[in-house]
Amino acid sequence: MSRTWIRNPLAIFTANGLDAAGGLVVEDGRIVELLGAGQQPAQPCASQFDASRHVVLPGLVNTHHHFYQTLTRAWAPVVNQPLFPWLKTLYPVWARLTPEKLELATKVALAELLLSGCTTAADHHYLFPGGLEQAIDVQAGVVEELGMRAMLTRGSMSLGEKDGGLPPQQTVQEAETILADSERLIARYHQRGDGARVQIALAPCSPFSVTPEIMRASAEVAARHDVRLHTHLAETLDEEDFCLQRFGLRTVDYLDSVGWLGPRTWLAHGIHFNAEEIRRLGEAGTGICHCPSSNMRLASGICPTVELEAAGAPIGLGVDGSASNDASNMILEARQALYLQRLRYGAERITPELALGWATRGSARLLGRSDIGELAPGKQADLALFKLDELRFSGSHDPLSALLLCAADRADRVMVGGAWRVVDGAVEGLDLAALIARHRAAASALIAG
């Protein structure tokens, strides 16, 4: 692949403090050189891209999502419900999911993410009703088609209503089925090393939808194959009450009891922790995905990011949903994180750079990846470029701050592994209008039953 100079950006955020005011050089899918202001590339470049009207970021990394939920956005019966009633109302609808509907939902979620500057996305898929046993295979095909990177987690629910869990019986699976499929997916799809496009993690859904046995067994499989672990934890006080009543343990004690407290694990939400639990999470190096939009939408609470980071727990961001956000937009999620965390910690402490760092380098750490999430020689050439020429940016002065403060919501250019996947604000090779029409029809059919 020829060398390309992304030249003289309006502003650039490297996520590591390195100077790249003069741009960067891409070759063979990687960044090979950062340039200071006025510097020229060390070797000739076959092509140049004038970035003088663009703010350049590392490709954003989304560390918690449920792609299938794009089919149930803004559904009236759940608009004003908190988490547990929200789930109980939606479970029967989601149980009607089919491979065709999942493919459309996944494509919509990934296209929306890509257009928002996201190049890597983790999805937590835990629904495998009859006929949808190959759900992760469906998702892997869409990831390849759109040319993104993904951490596809093999979620699971094994604790149904009849045994004291939250989900209805038609949405749960036996432990043997879950573990066999986990092994199959790791063998078939999990790529290792720099530049991996698809990786697999194991993700029993939550304390109120899986048994301790499947948590322990999943941890053993993950350790044996050196893959990561993911689950929802400490999202609501209802969940905390469930753990106390069923297990006699608070959430972090429960996590520890099933062998999950460690650096292999990242958790979605992580809101309701006391000081001792924060200390233990930090010492273990367990990561936390902050989902500000979802947490506000469901009135769940505010993640204690500052204390968690100070204790040693990595922090990343996730859009969650898309029935609890209800968008799949990573640059807007960084804005939400900025504002929600300022509400807790004050304006001086939570800066745009901190929020963007969570959305890039921090999120990459949650996924165990050191090759993405920042701009430096040797890193993957995953880039998000935003123009500031819309009405909302008129009168802004600091380009990097303007991305979040003025609510940027769509990238002009996005590069994944050295290849442009978004050009002039459109996904390459994707008929978006046709996709929207098919997706809307599928969403209506799902609700209608």
UniProtKB/Swiss-Prot annotation:
Determine if Metal-binding is one of this entry's keywords. Answer: yes
List, alphabetically, the InterPro entries matched. Answer: Amidohydro-rel, Metal-dep_hydrolase_composite, Metal_Hydrolase, MTA/SAH_deaminase
* Residues that coordinate or bind Zn(2+): 64, 66, 232, 269, 320
Q: Which residues bind substrate?
A: 69, 235, 269
- Keywords from the named record: Hydrolase, Metal-binding, Zinc
Pathway(s) annotated for this protein in UniProt: Purine metabolism
Cite the CDD domains for this sequence: ATZ_TRZ_like (cd01298)
Describe the reaction catalysed, as an equation.
8-oxoguanine + H2O + H(+) = urate + NH4(+)
Q: What class of enzyme is it?
A: hydrolase
The cofactor binding remark recorded in the entry reads: Binds 1 zinc ion per subunit.
**GO cellular component terms given for this protein:** cytosol
Q: Name one Pfam family in it.
A: Amidohydro_1
What is a GO molecular function of this protein? Answer: 8-oxoguanine deaminase activity
**In the Enzyme Commission scheme, what number(s) does this protein have?**
3.5.4.32
Q: Which cofactor does it need?
A: Zn(2+)
What function does this protein fulfil?
Answer: Specifically deaminates 8-Oxoguanine (8-oxoG) to uric acid. 8-oxoG is formed via the oxidation of guanine within DNA by reactive oxygen species and leads, if uncorrected, to the incorporation of 8-oxoG:A mismatches and eventually to G:C to T:A transversions.
* Subunit field text: Homodimer.
Task: Give the similarity note.
Answer: Belongs to the metallo-dependent hydrolases superfamily. ATZ/TRZ family.
Name the chain's protein: 8-oxoguanine deaminase
Q: Which organism is it from?
A: Pseudomonas aeruginosa (strain ATCC 15692 / DSM 22644 / CIP 104116 / JCM 14847 / LMG 12228 / 1C / PRS 101 / PAO1)
